Amino acid sequence: MKDTKLVKLTGTSADKNVLEEAGRLIRQGELVIFPTETVYGIGANGLDAVACRAIYTAKGRPSDNPLILTVPDKAGVEAVVSYLPPLAETLIEKFWPGPLTLVLPRKDTVPDAATGGLDTVALRCPDHAGCREFLKAAGVPIAGPSAAAEAFHDMEGRVAMILDGGSCTVGVESTIVEVLDNVVTVLRPGAVTEEMLAEVAPYVTTDTHLVTGKGVPKAPGMKYRHYAPEAPVRVFVGSADQVSKAVGEVRTAAENDGKRLGYLLSREVIEKSEVTGKDVYCWGTHGNKTELAKELYRGLLFFDEHPVDLIVAEGVETGGIGTAVMNRMKKAADGDVTTV
């Protein structure tokens, strides 16, 4: 067990010494949890195979699931890719710093442990000033798969330091795209939508298949679920009236079976369904995709702390960031999503 140092960032010059210490720990092969605008990351030196493997151990992550390397700027990309397509440069200029990850051909200096053995590497520059200062202090690309801020206590003893930067502004992981010639393929939806990508890319397509068996995914989220609570999840999408009716039907059946339900719902559906008590988590206003994106993982993890037999959740329509939200909800629910 490690002695984990927890530090709250202030967003001021007072953070400088802490960020330099965190960067030094990364260079020494240690793990550091750090904030971004999307979700928190479990960071390690992305050029150190041993450190990257330590991430898999700490998180219990399959080693064939590629890691995303975070860099402070475009120069950080050029240091680890063998070729930077012109279209990728355009995407960097348009969307960085921001929630867009690019999958590009890698140099041999990037270890297989960071790429799942693929000949490509996933790269991102976060839109978070403290994070970028941390990256500069480290002086190396930082491999940083997602970590839930609400589950910091689970990582104590596994990492050297936790940089607590408060709530993330986006709430779901970055969009991941592969760039080949003039084609951008979305491997994982996120806050940078297909519509936004189409404004600068000649052709945009989506790879929706899930990798199974011994296949190696090109990006995180293509083979394994992101966050999922211990309890099964059932998701309903529709008007507040329709969802509240569906919630009522599930509640009646659960009461007859003696099951305890958890409710992850909008304010309007909670009121219409008349559900109360400690097993209710309100994620925001009905239909507000941005609010659900920010609260989704916090809400799912809430029910690990308040165990239930089944979580009844309310989703949103796809489109915009709603596509990313429903991608995560569908995986958390193992596909149990119903439009009512």
Q: Can you name each region flagged by the protein language model?
A:
Residues 1-340:
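Active-site-adjacent structural elements in enzyme catalytic cores
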